[in-house]
From Swiss-Prot:
The keyword Nucleus does not apply. May be beta-lysylated on the epsilon-amino group of Lys-34 by the combined action of EpmA and EpmB, and then hydroxylated on the C5 position of the same residue by EpmC (if this protein is present). Lysylation is critical for the stimulatory effect of EF-P on peptide-bond formation. The lysylation moiety may extend toward the peptidyltransferase center and stabilize the terminal 3-CCA end of the tRNA. Hydroxylation of the C5 position on Lys-34 may allow additional potential stabilizing hydrogen-bond interactions with the P-tRNA. Pathway: Protein biosynthesis; polypeptide chain elongation. The lineage of its organism: Bacteria, Pseudomonadati, Pseudomonadota, Gammaproteobacteria, Enterobacterales. Disulfide bonds: none annotated. PANTHER family: ELONGATION FACTOR P, ELONGATION FACTOR P (EF-P) FAMILY PROTEIN. It is found in: Cytoplasm. One of its GO terms (molecular function) is translation elongation factor activity. The modification N6-(3,6-diaminohexanoyl)-5-hydroxylysine is found at residue 34. Belongs to the elongation factor P family. Its main location: cytoplasm. This is Elongation factor P.
Length: 188
C-alpha cells in the first residue's frame, strides 16, 4: 500500500493507524511563524464510527488502508446477517449487525448501498442519501395547532421514527435524509 505524508492528507483518504483503518474527514496544514509545520487532522474510525482529532508533524507518515467501497444492492435480513449482492458479478455478501449499525432502519429491499470492505470483510454499510418510506403510525394533525414546534413524531415502515410536519398523515409516503434522519418532503 502507498505511504502518505501528513501534508498529503485530504478528506476521503483512508489510512491505517494503530492497526485499524481510519478515514480522513478534514485536514488543516499549519505553518506557524516559529517551529515546525504540522497538520491538524479529523479522522473517523471505520470499525466503530467514532471521531478522533489528531496532530501530525510534517514528517509523519501513514500507510494507506486496504479499504474498498463497493456499490451493492440490499437483498434481505435473515435475523442475523444482512445480505447484499453485486449487480455485475451476482456475488452475494453478508454483513453482520455491527457493520450495519444504526443504518439498518434505512435499508429497503433492492436499495443501492455502499458497503466498505476491509480485508474482504464488511466493516460499514452506508444507505442511499435519501429513502422514500411509508408512515405507518402518527398522531392526527389538528387544524390550527401551531402553538408547538410544528412537528410530530411518525413511525415509518422500517421502524424508524422521524419528526414530520403536522399536515402529514398515516399512510403517506415521505422522503427522508438518511444522513441526518430528517423529513425532507412528501412523495407525490
Amino acid at each position: 500500500m502507498a505511504t502518505y505524508y501528513s501534508n498529503d492528507f485530504r478528506a476521503g483518504l483512508k489510512i491505517m493507524m494503530d492497526g485499524e483503518p481510519y478515514a480522513v474527514e478534514a485536514s488543516e496544514f499549519v505553518k506557524p511563524g516559529k517551529g515546525q509545520a504540522f497538520a491538524r487532522v479529523k479522522l473517523r474510525r471505520l470499525l466503530t464510527g467514532t471521531r478522533v482529532e489528531k496532530t501530525f508533524k510534517s514528517t509523519d507518515s501513514a500507510e494507506g488502508a486496504d479499504v474498498v467501497d463497493m456499490n451493492l444492492t440490499y437483498l434481505y435480513n435473515d435475523g442475523e446477517f444482512y445480505h447484499f449482492m453485486n449487480n455485475t458479478t451476482f456475488e452475494q455478501l453478508s454483513a453482520d449487525e455491527k457493520a450495519v449499525g444504526e443504518n439498518a432502519k434505512w435499508l429497503l429491499d433492492q436499495a443501492e448501498c455502499i458497503v466498505t470492505l476491509w480485508n474482504g470483510q464488511p466493516i460499514s454499510v452506508t444507505p442511499p442519501n435519501f429513502v422514500e418510506l411509508e408512515i405507518i403510525e402518527t398522531d392526527p394533525g389538528l387544524k390550527g395547532d401551531t402553538a408547538g414546534t410544528g412537528g410530530k413524531p411518525a413511525k415509518l415502515s422500517t421502524g424508524a421514527v422521524v419528526k414530520v410536519p403536522l399536515f402529514v398523515q398515516t399512510g403517506e409516503v415521505i422522503k427522508v435524509d438518511t444522513r441526518s434522519g430528517e423529513y425532507v418532503s412528501r412523495v407525490k
